[in-house]
Amino acid sequence: MAELMLLSEIADPTRFFTDNLLSPEDWGLQNSTLYSGLDEVAEEQTQLFRCPEQDVPFDGSSLDVGMDVSPSEPPWELLPIFPDLQVKSEPSSPCSSSSLSSESSRLSTEPSSEALGVGEVLHVKTESLAPPLCLLGDDPTSSFETVQINVIPTSDDSSDVQTKIEPVSPCSSVNSEASLLSADSSSQAFIGEEVLEVKTESLSPSGCLLWDVPAPSLGAVQISMGPSLDGSSGKALPTRKPPLQPKPVVLTTVPMPSRAVPPSTTVLLQSLVQPPPVSPVVLIQGAIRVQPEGPAPSLPRPERKSIVPAPMPGNSCPPEVDAKLLKRQQRMIKNRESACQSRRKKKEYLQGLEARLQAVLADNQQLRRENAALRRRLEALLAENSELKLGSGNRKVVCIMVFLLFIAFNFGPVSISEPPSAPISPRMNKGEPQPRRHLLGFSEQEPVQGVEPLQGSSQGPKEPQPSPTDQPSFSNLTAFPGGAKELLLRDLDQLFLSSDCRHFNRTESLRLADELSGWVQRHQRGRRKIPQRAQERQKSQPRKKSPPVKAVPIQPPGPPERDSVGQLQLYRHPDRSQPAFLDAIDRREDTFYVVSFRRDHLLLPAISHNKTSRPKMSLVMPAMAPNETLSGRGAPGDYEEMMQIECEVMDTRVIHIKTSTVPPSLRKQPSPTPGNATGGPLPVSAASQAHQASHQPLYLNHP
């Protein structure tokens, strides 16, 4: 048996290499037709090839192949008639025409060397017309197609005819279409002639659709030798017109059964070019000449051979391999395209990432600067806030301290050192105890010596009198030195006068002033009736309009000790009074004064005190009514007439009076006896009661 080898290519395999990377320009719009053409071939390749179950003989009426034997000696006489032919069809390289011829010669010598016997090589040359237009490249090659047939005899009287068919021209593309063998195309084989001329009509493509490299022809011509059905010579076998279909690069082995009649062979020609249905069809007639390589011996008798196209494959047996190869090539192209696109996308993505990174870095730097500025501003604000907090705290503390100090100076107790006192009498230096105040009293048994009746008003000028060298010192805790005392007094006067502005009745004020003046005058007249007094007392009570009377300081220290019983006596010679004494008591014209040098006084403290008003003080002293009938009390011995003066304490202070300024009548006093307000002696019961009252807690007397 013989094998039928089919080989077809749709593209040059040398075009693709491992290091052949397509540039982005290769995937432009100019190569879109190549991809569309490959896709169409992939879709139609399953319909182009079919595996026939049996060989279909061609009749001479269907295929008219004329073969003219030009040489004088036919090449078929010396060669045995082989029933099978092995045809190998390969496209030539589209590089140059020299490569075509070299490839043809190389392929033609290979089967001859493998033959078992002496063989001859038949060259079949097919000529075709040039296409009207070629769009593939700049160097269109020749349009001739050379078919080389090698006929090699075998040991079992079987000859294999190897035929190499080269493509007509590199301008033929995938879209080229071959028409069926018509009646115009004829193939005649003459036994007696050495030259076998095969006249075929082939289609020429209208134009090449590839741009860069012209693709080889996809068509292939298959020539097979088979036994002739009829033994008559000189008549061509009836053949039919099979379509020429394209076939990818594939090596197909088709077993051919041996025929019983060896003299008759059948040559089948099959074109594997399938053009698109819309492309124009151009018929090209070419003559195929088979020439022997060596001298061909003459044959005893000519035999007729019919060249018929090979049967079309019906099933999808060979296309399975072809489809894989085509898909692999398409995958290769798509992979390269996708790789290029992925690289381009990756590059664009990286460029976008770099741009975004630069923008983010710029924003980050700007945010860092803003953050630093805000941090500095925050630190400045915190420092300022801390300073303000400390300042406000100090300010609050200072305000509170000033307020507390003001309260302490105005309402709290003040301890101020007292000024230097006057010279102390020798009796005080001897350590005699200072007498205390007690109730005033008069004694009738001991008349007062050297007392003159009071003449004139108490408001007149005083007569200067000599004073002894010794004088007691008065002091208390509220004494002030020098100018500070006067300033504090003025401030206190302003404070009390401004805070207590009471409204008073003018008529009532005049009535009180007149009553006090009358009391002083009556007391002075009553004192004139007394011839002599046991002690000299001096009392100065000026006449003024304002009702309040200044009180004598409480518990004055240090005068000479006197009798516990004494008599109240007014100053009787205002004309001879000393100005030094009046200046010592700081006499004012609008104030009544009650001056007493006695130590016996009954002092009753206040049980409660109203903090919203000044402290009040009531003075109760002996007084005499204008006449006894006005008193309304009956006999003078039953009742004591007393003058009660209600006043508010404006100020208390300690004054120092020199002993020399005190009138002589008031300096030395005998032991007084208790008496009444009119100068009369007090009853013994009253004196004893006064002495007993000194032991009570509400009385202050001499110890």
UniProtKB/Swiss-Prot annotation:
Residue positions the entry lists as glycosylated: 476, 505, 610, 627, 676
Gene3D superfamilies linked: 1.20.5.170
A single GO BP: ATF6-mediated unfolded protein response
Tissue: Ubiquitous.
Location(s), subcellular: Endoplasmic reticulum membrane
Residues the record lists as N-acetylalanine modifications: 2
Sequence segments annotated as region (Leucine-zipper): 350-357
Renumbered residue ranges of the record's region Disordered: 87-114, 229-248, 293-317, 447-479, 521-565, 660-703
Topology of this chain in the membrane: Single-pass type II membrane protein
Keywords: Acetylation, Activator, DNA-binding, Endoplasmic reticulum, Glycoprotein, Membrane, Nucleus, Signal-anchor, Transcription, Transcription regulation, Transmembrane, Transmembrane helix, Unfolded protein response
Swiss-Prot/TrEMBL site (Important for cleavage by MBTPS2) positions: 410, 413
Top-rank taxon, per record: Eukaryota
Polar residues bias locations: 660-676
Lumenal side: 418-703
Changes after translation: N-glycosylated.
Family per similarity comment: Belongs to the bZIP family. ATF subfamily.
PANTHER family associated with the record: ATF6, ISOFORM C (PTHR46164), CYCLIC AMP-DEPENDENT TRANSCRIPTION FACTOR ATF-6 BETA (PTHR46164:SF2)
Written domain comment of the UniProt record: The basic domain functions as a nuclear localization signal. The basic leucine-zipper domain is sufficient for association with the NF-Y trimer and binding to ERSE.
Protein name, entry field: Cyclic AMP-dependent transcription factor ATF-6 beta
Species for this entry: Homo sapiens (Human)
